Amino acid sequence: MLSPAIITLPWRPDAAEHYFAPLSALPWAMLLHSGFADHPHNRFDILVAAPRATLLTRGEQTWVDDGETVVVSAEDPLQLLQQQLDRQPFTPQPHDDLPFLGGALGLFGYDLGRRFERLPSHAQADIALADMAVGIYDWALIVDHQRQQISLLSYDDPQQRLQWLEAQTPTPGETFALTSAWQSNMSRQQYGEKFRQVQAYLHSGDCYQVNLAQRFQASYVGDEWQAFRQLNTVNRAPFSAFIRLDEGAILSLSPERFIQLRQGEIQTRPIKGTLPRLDSPPEDAQQAEKLANSPKDRAENLMIVDLMRNDIGRVAVPGSVRVPELFVVEPFPAVHHLVSTITARLSMTLHASDLLRAAFPGGSITGAPKVRAMEIIDELEPQRRNAWCGSIGYLSYCGNMDTSITIRTLTAWQGQLYCSAGGGIVADSEEAAEYQETFDKVNRILQQLEN
C-alpha cells in the first residue's frame, strides 16, 4: 500500500496563486480554487501540474498518453480513466484533511454526455476543445483555509517537487484585454422563438423542464490567467477552477457542487432558482425571502431533486438516498440561489467513476426528464455547450471524488472567449423574466472583463 509523503509549507493565504502563477502557461497545469468564498465549502485549494498520464476525449475517441506511448481507444472514456487509476501502484487511505491524494483531475465537458446517452447532432460543434481532458497526477499542493495549512504531497520526493516548484519562473504574459464587445449567439427575438418552442414541448407533455441558454462571445488578447485572477477575486465562488490545455484554457467561477464522494458517502447540491442581489440590505433580505417562497422556483428545484435522486439511486445502496436540505437560499456576490442537498451511500462494488457516469451531466443544467431535455437543448441551442455545464473536479487514488457543475464558466480558444448562461424553463415561466435571468447570472463576469 503506497501512500504519499507529505511536507508542510509556511502559511500564506494566497499560496495557490503564488505557486500556480509560474505554472499557469504550462499545458495540464490545473487549479481548483475555493474562491476565498465566505461559504462552508470554501476549505481547499488544489494545485497540480506535470501529470504522469493524460486522457483526451474528442467525439468517439480517447487518446491515452502515459508519457511513453499514446493509445487511441473508442472505449467508454470513464472506463479508460478508471483503468489508468487502477494501473497506478498507489492505494492511500482517505485522509480527513487532504481531500485529494493524487489521482485524476480535470475537465469533463457537457458533450462527454454523448458517450453515455444517444443524442442527436443538430448543434454546431464550433469549439474544438476536448470533451474530456484529465491528467493523472502523483503530487499536489493543497491549501487548507480552515486549518491554515499548506501540504505538498508526492509519491516521489516532496522536497524535490518543492525545489521544482520554487525554480519555476513566471513569464510575464501580455496584459489581458477584450478586443471586441460581447455578442450573443441569438437575438432577443430568436430567444423568444426558442422559449415558445420549449413551452410547446412542455404543454404537450414531452418534458417538465428544459434549461435553455444563450452564449456570449468576444475576442481577446493576453494572458487568460490574469483574467481568471481578476474574476476570482470579485466573484468568490467556492468551486472556481483554472485549467490550461494545449489548445486553450477554462476559467470557471462556479458556485455549484455536482457530486462529492467521501469514504463512500455521496452528496450532490443542485442549484435551481435564482434572483439578483439588491444593494439595500433590507431589500436584499426580502429578495432572499421571495426566492425561498417562490412556488415556481420550488417546483423547478423539486423536479431536479427528483431527477438527481433517480440518477444517484442507480449506483447507491438501496434505501440510502436522502434529502436532508430542501429549498435553502444561499447568497453569492451577484445572485441568491435556491439549493437542495441529496445524500446516499455508494454501492460497495462501484467506483467514483461509476457514480460520475450514472449522473452525468448534472440534471440541474439539463431539465427533466434528462435525456429528452438534452435532445431539446441540442435542437434549440445553436452551438454545442462544450466545457460549459459539464464538470471540473478530481477522482482521488483514495476513492474520494469532488466535482463542480461548470456554470459561470468561460472557454478561451483561438483568441475567442465564450461564456454561456441559461435557466430552467417550466410551464409557468415568463419569457421576459427567463431572458433577464440569463443576464443576471453572468453580467458581473462579462462587465468585469470589459473594464
Feature map (PLM): residue ranges:
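Extended alpha-helical targeting/anchoring segments
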Residues: 1-451
